[in-house]
Amino acid sequence: MSTFDNAVSIHPYFKVREGQLEACKSFLTRFNEKVAGEAKCLFYNFTFQGDVMCCREAYQDAEGVQAHLENVGALLGELLKIADLTRIELHGPAPELEKLKPVFAEMNPEYFICECGIGR
């Protein structure tokens, strides 16, 4: 079984508040340090287009996503003082996404169900 069979990726988009872009970029190293020890994290990085930031992240399964949220919850609260969450997408197999619906309900995410693909 590939580690990608149950993999879930999360794509939250943030609008960095005016004048906070450099502070936001500096803050991200704290996330990286915290996430580095997560056993079920497949990848975790940040991309930017102007003042819009996206965190590209994936986990082996829904359990890995839940562990991640517990790990970075306090940091996310701090980030939301300088950036606003504008959109969040969850991608993965339907059974794994179902497990996460109660966890993400208040964030009003868009769910994308994986129908086919390959993993290495």
Positions of the model-derived regions?
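Short S/T/G/P-rich N-terminal loop/turn motif that feeds into the first structured element of a domain
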Residues: 1-54, 60-70, 81-120
